[in-house]
Regions:
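N-terminal glycine-rich flavin-associated loop
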Residues: 1-7, 33-36
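A generic, well-ordered mixed alpha/beta core segment in the N-terminal half of proteins
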Residues: 4-17
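Residue-level signal for inorganic ion chemistry
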Residues: 5, 88, 116
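A short, Trp-centered hydrophobic/proline-enriched beta-strand micro-motif
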Residues: 19-27, 71
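Short glycine/proline-enriched turns and hinge-like loops at secondary-structure junctions
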Residues: 35-37, 48, 61-66, 80-84, ...
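A structural signal for short hydrophobic beta-strand segments in well-ordered beta-sheet cores
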Residues: 41-44
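A short core secondary-structure module
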Residues: 53-100
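Glycine-rich beta->alpha junctions and the first turn(s) of the following alpha-helix
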Residues: 97-170
């Protein structure tokens, strides 16, 4: 909502509101660990828009997603690894995208590697401003990681603490 174009919002918001669309977030890359600024997967300008290559790893529910919010390197900015990153709205049915499940110890497949091989996106798939992806994703992650789902995930611990304190005489 904050960074998407009016066209992008009109395209996806009705499906989000109706619970019909599933999204995944493609940021982490193989061999990068937790260093998001080290991502290398390129998005190169083409006559028709953007050409994506590379891979994302630990992408939750990519195998079920309709779309990905993907972070790619659109340019190299000397002395600023956070510069030159851009976000894209990616239809997961686009040719050239392969989703490989990562099986966890109990045998579940929640996480995935997503491989991009000459994936062609139109110009209007760029979210926000080219090269401003770092600021966009940090703003989005700050919201995501401080919203109701964050503190509500601790509700059982808080309720147990209230019960424990209520049971004490003083």
């Amino acid at each position: 909502l904050s960074f998407g174009s009016a066209e992008q919002c009109h395209k996806i918001l009705p499906g989000i509101a109706q619970g019909e669309l599933v999204f995944c977030i493609g940021m982490s890359e193989p061999d990068s660990g937790s260093d998001l600024a080290s991502l290398r997967s390129p998005a190169k300008r083409s006559d028709d828009g953007w050409l994506l290559n590379g891979a994302k790893i630990w992408t939750t529910n990519a195998h079920e997603a309709d779309y990905m919010f993907g972070l790619f390197r659109t340019s190299t900015v000397p002395d600023n690894r956070r510069g030159g990153l851009s976000q894209f709205l990616i239809d997961m049915k686009t040719p050239g995208i392969t989703v490989n499940p990562i099986v966890d110890l109990p045998g579940r497949e929640h996480f995935n590697e997503v491989v991009f091989e000459d994936v062609q996106l139109s110009h209007n798939c760029l979210i926000g401003t080219e090269g401003e992806g770092w600021d966009q994703v940090t703003a989005e992650l700050a919201y995501e990681r401080s919203g109701p789902e964050r503190y509500l995930s601790s509700i059982q611990i808080l309720l147990a603490l209230v019960d424990e304190l209520a049971a004490r005489p003083n």
